[in-house]
Amino acid sequence: PGLQVTMVEPKPHYYSCFGANWHFAGIRDLSKTKQTFDALRDKHGVEIVQDRVTGWDAEAGRAELAGGGQLSFDRLVVSPGIEFEWDKVDGMGPGDTDRVPHAWHGGEQYRILRRQLESMEDGGVVVLTAPPNPFRCPPGPYERISLIAHYLKQNKPKSKVLALDAKDGFAKQGLFEQGWRELYGDMIEWVSASDGGRLYEVDPKARTVWTQEGFQKHQADVLNVIPPQRAGRIAQEMGLTDRSGWCPVDQRTFASSQQPNVHVIGDSAIAGAMPKSGHAANNQGKMVAAAIVNQLRGQPVPDAKLVNTCYSLVSPTYGISVAAVYRFDGGKITGVEGSGGLSPSEADEFTRIKEARYARGWYDAITD
């Protein structure tokens, strides 16, 4: 009861990654994905400090704020998120995203991409480049491909979506491709890395990309480049990352392997078999909170089971999902054999409709 919890966050609100793709299909206005931190303060008594942590002394238990203040801590939990590895995108940088949006965080980026889709002539080509693993929200690019295709089918049916991928496979691939065939025919073309999909160079001004080591040119009318990713900048600056660019942790407590009294959760953490998803991060936060409380009380860390659930919309009325249960075993988080699973490939139309409804319900519940 005497525990004081303070959250330092520079923004008064944020736009959730999950649900943002729905904006492209007109399912939900982007404003509905705007979330605040009011419930943490009003329901749970968390002190909210609108500032930015610029660094800390883990041994001394002191964090420095951009506004000049300091905060003392017994435990520091950081969620650095992601940053883009622009040095791996030849020809493009952060200054080009008004013309070639990534639309992978931040509300305005989603609006830019939506406006470009609306302005495109019927018969145009939307090119999306999907990043290499690991990255935030593994099914995200493929839900986006689906919902852009839905918009085009309704409004610009002569158009197509060309997806160029840095990988040879992706999350829920069989279910997505089944939905694409059923709903969109040949409107969507997905090109794997082995077949020449790996991004080589971008010309933002011309909205042109090259693949196959620069030998294959693709001209876009709308170009959406999702860059390679690594742990957020503060994690890089404060030495929380390893050579992979991500943050190694004790996967039982998410305590940093690099510094004492610091825990890392969310997309930036190396979390074993768990994906970089919103549901996973939510579970990690709860588990880490329980672990810290027990440690401060001198009690054993709980033997927690972790869960991930991810819904994706192939159309407003066609939902698919994956679920998994995880445990700590042999020093890392592993999947529990026989748990979870995918939506059945043979599901009928009513089941797909129900899963689309469940997706909306899941979003409303996790953001409540």
Where would I find each of the regions flagged by the language model?
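C-terminal auxiliary extensions adjacent to catalytic cores
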Residues: 321-368
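Active-site substrate-recognition segment that forms the wall
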Residues: 132-156, 247, 256-265, 269-273, ...
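Beta1-alpha1 glycine-rich phosphate/pyrophosphate-binding loop at the start
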Residues: 1-47, 132-174
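Active-site-proximal substrate-binding core of FAD-dependent oxidoreductases
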Residues: 274, 291-338
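A Rossmann-like FAD-binding core segment of flavoenzymes
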Residues: 43-55, 59-64, 71, 150-245, ...
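Hydrophobic/aromatic beta-strand patches that form the interior of the parallel beta-sheet core
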Residues: 6-8, 49, 77, 127, ...
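FAD-binding core/adjacent interface of flavoenzyme oxidoreductases
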Residues: 47-143, 147-154, 224
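FAD-site-proximal beta/loop scaffold in flavoenzymes
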Residues: 93-120, 218-286, 294
